[in-house]
Curated annotation (Swiss-Prot):
Gene field: atpB
Keyword Transport appears in the UniProt entry: yes
Designated name of the protein: ATP synthase subunit a
Entry-linked Pfam families: ATP-synt_A
Keyword NAD included in the entry's annotation: no
InterPro entries given in the database record: ATP_syn_F0_a_bact/chloroplast, ATP_synth_F0_asu, ATP_synth_F0_asu_AS, F0_ATP_A_sf
Organism placement in taxonomy: Bacteria, Pseudomonadati, Thermodesulfobacteriota, Desulfobulbia, Desulfobulbales
GO MF, any single term: proton-transporting ATP synthase activity, rotational mechanism
The protein's role, per its UniProt record: Key component of the proton channel; it plays a direct role in the translocation of protons across the membrane.
Highest taxon listed in the record's lineage: Bacteria
A biological process from GO: proton motive force-driven plasma membrane ATP synthesis
Regions crossing the membrane: 41-61, 92-112, 121-141, 152-172, 191-211, 212-232
């Protein structure tokens, strides 16, 4: 659901760029100014600026900002190591942690009146899912070679006609389940908030749903990251 955001529209209009909530053309520049892309740039800028200003110079005795980031980053690092092993966690921490922070903020930004969540677009969630899906196959092939794909045909040759279609459907279903789960939940939150804002004003009536929206936003980010970790660990262990 696309809410009008005046200051972004004004800035882009003054720069001669397509307004994100107006008609969007077919050129590359116009595509980059579509609503979900505009808010993606906004989320990325927010994460960069917040980390820059809250961290500053790292100190031996950390301040409040450094303590906050050490808690978040340290917690994710321990979780990844417990579920994937230390070596694999170190290798994929930048990617998965970036996904976690991006998805959490992208989900939450839609709770601000006049903003929308980039993850309320299937384009965003499918792009994230494709990266995860492709990476977990790369991990499996790198760890086990062609033997990684033997689980698609089952342990016995006579089971191939049965196991191959089942395994292929199951594997490609991950693309749908991971992307549509995130998209569907966040889109439902956006639609419900939009209806309540329109019917009951900007503050009191939507407040309970906004509180629930915070929980949904964080839980969906956690679910996406958890499943990513599980897929990567399975690919490494060759256990499906």
């Amino acid at each position: 659901m696309e809410h009008p955001i005046l200051f972004i529209s004004i800035i882009l209009e003054k720069l001669g760029l397509p307004v994100p909530h107006g008609p969007v053309g077919q050129t590359f520049l116009e595509k980059m100014c579509e609503p979900y892309m505009t808010y993606t740039w906004l989320v990325m800028a927010f994460l960069f600026l917040v980390s820059k200003f809250t961290l500053g110079n790292l100190e031996i005795i950390p301040g409040k900002g450094q303590n906050f980031w050490e808690m978040i980053i340290g917690g994710m690092d321990d979780f990844f190591a417990d579920n994937m092993g230390r070596e694999m966690a170190d290798k994929f921490f930048p990617m998965i942690a970036t996904f976690a922070l991006y998805i959490a903020v992208a989900n939450l930004i839609g709770l601000i009146p006049g903003f929308m969540s980039p993850t309320a677009s299937i384009n965003t969630t499918l792009a994230l899912t494709l990266i995860v899906w492709a990476t977990h196959h790369v991990i499996g092939f790198k760890e086990h070679g062609l033997g990684y794909y033997k689980h698609f045909i089952g342990p016995m040759k006579w089971l191939v006609p049965l196991m191959l279609p089942i395994e292929l459907i199951s594997n490609f279903a991950r693309l749908l389940s991971l992307s549509i789960r995130l998209f569907g939940n966040i889109m439902a939150k956006e639609v419900l908030l939009g209806i309540l804002f329109g019917l009951a004003g900007m503050f009191f009536a939507p407040l309970p749903i906004m509180v629930l929206g915070v929980l949904v936003s964080l839980v969906q980010a956690m679910v996406f990251v958890l499943l990513t970790v599980v897929y990567f660990a399975q690919a490494q262990e060759h256990a499906h």
